[in-house]
Amino acid sequence: MNTEVMHSTSTESDAQEKPQAMFDTSAMRVLAVLAEKEALTPDSYPMSLNALTNGCNQLTSRDPVMAMGEDEVREILQHLIQEKFIAEVNQAGARVSKYEHRLRMKWSLEQDKLAVLTILMLRGIQTAGEIRNRSGRLHEFASIADVEAGLQFLMDKYPPLVVRLPRAPGTKEARYASLLCGESYPETAEGAAYAASAAAGVSRQDRIAQLEGEVGALREEVAALAAQLQQFRQQFE
């Protein structure tokens, strides 16, 4: 697996056509875990190689779930240290080196923006509501509007760190995704696939509602026929 951090040297027009990857998915996972654990378990932060590897392979709050080895994580750490996204910390009396992220300094992020970005890095595509529900221990957002303000800040960075995806038919909220791995979400690809999936779901719901209405109408007709039959019988009693 290639863990090398990549930087863009393309022109602005090239960046608009396709986002340039800063990391691969494994490097992004390492950074996201450091950002997450800093907030969730400050007493165990900075993190050792073993703890960081376990965090990368965690089964909960991760999409996708990964299976990374310590050698792979160690190699990623060395690349990220060279690029100054991570710092190695040698604490007095500690037997092992520990590591901390430097995302705030690199991208001038306050904790609310870092929390939003961390959720997208760990969980993939999310709505603003989902980000708010899942970031409580990273940052307590008072409203979805506060989340959207953080998302807008990340989208306004150059190059942008986050993208807003097209709102699919039948959905109320836009969805957002990280651009750190050079993902591209054109309407003809991911956006269209999601829209088609959602549209299919809406179509199925409409069909179910139609069938339920037809069944209800048939029941009424049967009840009316039963009443007429009862009246007919009463004429001969």
UniProtKB/Swiss-Prot annotation:
InterPro entries: DUF480 (IPR007432), WH-like_DNA-bd_sf (IPR036388), WH_DNA-bd_sf (IPR036390). Residues 1-21 are annotated as: Disordered. Residues 1-13 have a biased composition (Polar residues). Belongs to the UPF0502 family. HAMAP family: UPF0502 (MF_01584). This is UPF0502 protein HEAR1280. It comes from Herminiimonas arsenicoxydans. The lineage of its organism: Bacteria, Pseudomonadati, Pseudomonadota, Betaproteobacteria, Burkholderiales.
